[in-house]
Amino acid sequence: MIELTHASFQYENSDRGVQDISLSVKSGECVVLTGLSGCGKTTVTRLVNGLAPSYYPGVFSGSVRIDGKDISRLSTWEIGRLVGSVFQDPKSQFFSSELAGEVAFPCENYGLSAREIRERTDAAIEALQLSHLKDRAVDILSSGEKQRAAIASVYAMKPKVFVCDEPTANLDAAGTRQLAQTLWQLKEQGFTLLLAEHRIDWLMGIADRFLYLRDGRIAAEYTPEDLRLLPEADILGMGLRSPHEGKCLPAPSVLDESPAVLKTAGLSKRIRKEVIFDDVSISFPEGKVTAITGQNGAGKTTLAQILCGLTRQTRGHILIDGKKARAAARRREIYYCGNDTSTQFFTASVAEELLP
């Protein structure tokens, strides 16, 4: 189904890329590309879905075939009928404001009949277990729900191949389990899956093979059983998350009573009629690390953005050093680093980004 033969690609004005990639993925197989950040995983997925070099300019050699077709001879829309892509940040591929419209959009874009659009949209939403969210605005979906919405929009087009780039990057444990179930169902239905992922534990029951990339080349191939038998030190040395249960650092035996530099009092947030969280009162001790955890959609990101003054609360107060602090004051005192760091960059180079 997927055939890369001596495929090499180097990005324009960069030394990054992949060299001499030859791989074959059979119909209905699930293959995972894994390795350290920057090893070439994403670039291989871009060769398969045609984004490189059509969208990402660079020098390409070799061949890429999908279902026997040389994609260099296909137009972008023709590749899109064969290969569906799900990106690390699903927001980057949304075109509609509500879920049903988002799932229908690819079918509309390809000019399918109104009847077929409705049938495919309803079938995709049901298959991805999103019926209860059908009319929900996509901007208030949890990360896991957004990922499933992105998969549903691809599913509606019935491609032969699904390409997923780091699909669990923004998912919690529950969202990851849900995604694993979704991909397993797709595989059972005969779809071919190619994933780029460095978290391998959740894929052990889905993947048929793992291809380990290093410096833009395929360095090794493993079955799930091969990886289970590798010493944990070897897996960590490869830059991968262990397929075994993780270990936590020990908690301090004594918790000292440090003064609270930041507090919330009765904090509540609603978006339209949706209650994101209600009556949250937290103290953040000076010089300590406080972790806010919970499932996708619990309100963690919204709370962080409110603390930093990037969005407003519905009710309640935030205090810095015991004094109420308005949003403008918080923006001067508290800094925010989101899960998609690319949205915080304003310049084209590291040096320019760091300049005041």
Language-model features and meaning:
Residues 162-165:
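Catalytic Walker B motif of ABC-type/P-loop ATPase nucleotide-binding domains
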Residues 197-198:
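H-loop/switch region of ABC-family ATPase nucleotide-binding domains
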Residues 34-36, 293-295:
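The feature captures the beta-strand-to-loop junction immediately N-terminal to the Walker
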Residues 115-133:
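Conserved ABC ATPase "signature" region
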Residues 137-141, 145:
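Conserved ABC ATPase signature
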Residues 57-69, 316-330:
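Conserved ABC transporter NBD signature motif
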Residues 49, 308:
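Helix-to-loop junction immediately C-terminal to a conserved catalytic motif
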